[in-house]
């Protein structure tokens, strides 16, 4: 007895969208996309980096690109409504919205937006990122922005992965000094290299996070042509700042806190003045497996 299996196109029945090439962020703004293994500290890094840019006198917009919508709460001190939720309330008639419905001011004037995402298993994260940028442009909210930071979910290398890369100048990859994080970073490098053929985005460098040492990261950088732009050790004040729902710049200025603050300020300054586009050559899975570890 034979059975007939109906085959469907990948994504059929899901919320899908093609990115509109006309929906771009104005030239002049520095646009950074932050990637990395899930749970590595991208939102912490993004929020503190946004705060650092604001400390340098820049007008900053942070866009959280994760259905968990927890990218900006240390800036706003609360969980803000997502763009997709707000659009659903008005049946996707964006002309009915006001900027205050979906954009919120956080620490030191940093403007915050959470794109949100479709229900699990029903679509692509790139859809809501594209809709978010479109909405911001419709309301002329990007015209006076100096820095835009996209905080992107996990290390998913799919169609939605390309949405922030359509707009970004540079990509920062957050990693720890361990195999899993660096393995994920290698996959992200591969994806960015592929997308860079069509978009202006380039690799900006590596952020070593929650790591006392960087020996494994250094090995990877030496082989692939990447560069560590900042190193944040496993400082308990960073963990406590998340629990306090604030940035590291709002914590009591202990020696450890001041060191972290200065590292973020240095990273922000380098991204503005001293960043060099990196080519980056990803390794094959077997090569990275053999590279990392102790001799």
UniProtKB/Swiss-Prot annotation:
Highest taxon of the source?
A: Bacteria
Would the keyword Nucleotide-binding turn up in this protein's UniProt record? yes
What are the recorded Gene Ontology BP terms? light-independent chlorophyll biosynthetic process; photosynthesis, dark reaction
> Which residues bind Mg(2+) per the record?
43
Q: In which pathway does it act?
A: Porphyrin-containing compound metabolism; chlorophyll biosynthesis (light-independent)
Locate the residues binding [4Fe-4S] cluster: 124, 158
Q: Catalyses which reaction?
A: chlorophyllide a + oxidized 2[4Fe-4S]-[ferredoxin] + 2 ADP + 2 phosphate = protochlorophyllide a + reduced 2[4Fe-4S]-[ferredoxin] + 2 ATP + 2 H2O
Record's cofactor remark: Binds 1 [4Fe-4S] cluster per dimer.
- Mind telling me which SUPFAM superfamilies this protein's record contains? P-loop containing nucleoside triphosphate hydrolases
- Give the EC class as a word: oxidoreductase
A Pfam family cross-referenced in the UniProt record is Fer4_NifH
Enzyme Commission number(s): 1.3.7.7
| Keyword annotations from UniProtKB, A to Z | 4Fe-4S, ATP-binding, Chlorophyll biosynthesis, Iron, Iron-sulfur, Magnesium, Metal-binding, Nucleotide-binding, Oxidoreductase, Photosynthesis
Give the family, as the similarity comment puts it: Belongs to the NifH/BchL/ChlL family.
- PANTHER family associated with the record: LIGHT-INDEPENDENT PROTOCHLOROPHYLLIDE REDUCTASE IRON-SULFUR ATP-BINDING PROTEIN
Describe the function of this protein: Component of the dark-operative protochlorophyllide reductase (DPOR) that uses Mg-ATP and reduced ferredoxin to reduce ring D of protochlorophyllide (Pchlide) to form chlorophyllide a (Chlide). This reaction is light-independent. The L component serves as a unique electron donor to the NB-component of the complex, and binds Mg-ATP.
Summarize subunit and interaction data from the UniProt record for this chain.
Homodimer. Protochlorophyllide reductase is composed of three subunits; ChlL, ChlN and ChlB.
Question: In its UniProt entry, what is this protein called?
Answer: Light-independent protochlorophyllide reductase iron-sulfur ATP-binding protein
Native source species: Prochlorococcus marinus (strain MIT 9515)
Q: Which gene name belongs to this protein?
A: chlL
């Amino acid at each position: 007895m034979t059975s007939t299996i109906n085959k469907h196109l990948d994504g059929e029945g899901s919320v899908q969208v093609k990115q509109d090439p006309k929906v771009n962020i104005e030239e002049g703004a520095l646009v950074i996309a932050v990637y990395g293994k899930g749970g590595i500290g991208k939102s912490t890094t993004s929020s503190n980096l946004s705060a650092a840019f604001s400390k340098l006198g820049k007008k900053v917009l942070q866009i959280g690109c994760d259905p968990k919508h927890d990218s900006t709460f240390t800036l706003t001190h609360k969980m803000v409504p997502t763009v997709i939720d707000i659009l659903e309330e008005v049946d996707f008639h964006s002309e009915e919205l006001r900027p205050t419905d979906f954009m919120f001011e956080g620490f030191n004037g940093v403007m915050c937006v959470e794109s949100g995402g479709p229900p699990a298993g029903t679509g692509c994260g790139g859809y809501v990122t594209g809709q978010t940028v479109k909405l911001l442009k419709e309301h002329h909210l990007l015209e006076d922005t100096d820095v835009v930071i996209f905080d992107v979910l996990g290390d998913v290398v799919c169609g939605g992965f390309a949405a922030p890369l359509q707009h970004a100048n540079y990509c920062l990859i957050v990693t720890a000094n361990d195999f899993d994080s660096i393995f994920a970073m290698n996959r992200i490098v591969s994806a960015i290299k592929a997308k860079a053929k069509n978009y202006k985005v380039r690799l900006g460098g590596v952020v070593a996070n929650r790591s006392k040492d960087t020996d494994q990261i250094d090995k990877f950088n030496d082989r692939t042509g990447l560069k560590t732009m900042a190193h944040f050790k496993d400082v308990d004040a960073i963990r406590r700042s998340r629990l306090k729902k604030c940035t590291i710049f709002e914590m009591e200025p202990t020696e450890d806190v001041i060191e972290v603050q200065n590292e973020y300020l240095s990273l922000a300054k380098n991204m503005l003045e001293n960043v060099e586009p990196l080519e980056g050559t990803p390794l094959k899975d077997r090569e990275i497996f053999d590279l990392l570890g102790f001799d």
